[in-house]
């Protein structure tokens, strides 16, 4: 099951999930793309999102406006849907309308072997890494996340720039091995690191829970600001009306 948490009042770009992208609202494009891989549902926090989903025949459930994270919203949706405890759950951010279905499928498969949870990242250049809206991640020798940050990590002190630069940009999708793990993560007390960085995945690392990171090739652009949207529209200027 793929759950898309969709919040209307985004702090950096209000109503962004309803922004039109080549004929489709952003959240609808996310859902149509995800539904090519697995069953998909949108976890709404506002009637306007629900109405848009219904208009485009997208399955949706209404959740509380008071969740602190998309993960909490996904858990409520999973509970409302009555998902089995052993069912794998993907949390696809509602601002990833350009994420390739192949990447979603790869994460769904990788989640089978992840003891706790999994996510995706792609190689980025130093200029892109300077953007605090693009979250960076560093890994251990088994491709488990060591840390996520809005800062440039690792810091390239005296690094030979002729070598491949080990900079990885995080992609806004998470896979949970089963519903019970989703419940476990939400039961953990928020930590200071996630509050400082405003990155919910840091809670798992703080409590020593592994996040397996699948390195993928992707042209996807997460939409955090109006500028992101305008830049993305220039890049993806030939998308069809439906994914």
From Swiss-Prot:
Keywords: Cytoplasm, Lipopolysaccharide biosynthesis, Nucleotidyltransferase, Transferase. It is found in: Cytoplasm. It catalyses: 3-deoxy-alpha-D-manno-oct-2-ulosonate + CTP = CMP-3-deoxy-beta-D-manno-octulosonate + diphosphate. GO terms for molecular function: 3-deoxy-manno-octulosonate cytidylyltransferase activity. It comes from the Bacteria. Pathway: Nucleotide-sugar biosynthesis; CMP-3-deoxy-D-manno-octulosonate biosynthesis; CMP-3-deoxy-D-manno-octulosonate from 3-deoxy-D-manno-octulosonate and CTP: step 1/1; Bacterial outer membrane biogenesis; lipopolysaccharide biosynthesis. It holds the Pfam family CTP_transf_3. One of its GO terms (biological process) is lipopolysaccharide biosynthetic process. InterPro entries: Cytidylyl_trans, KdsB, Nucleotide-diphossugar_trans. It is an enzyme of class 2 (transferase). Its EC number is 2.7.7.38. GO terms for cellular component: cytosol. Its main location: cytoplasm. The keyword Transferase applies. Activates KDO (a required 8-carbon sugar) for incorporation into bacterial lipopolysaccharide in Gram-negative bacteria. NCBIfam families: kdsB, PRK05450.1-5. Belongs to the KdsB family. This is 3-deoxy-manno-octulosonate cytidylyltransferase.
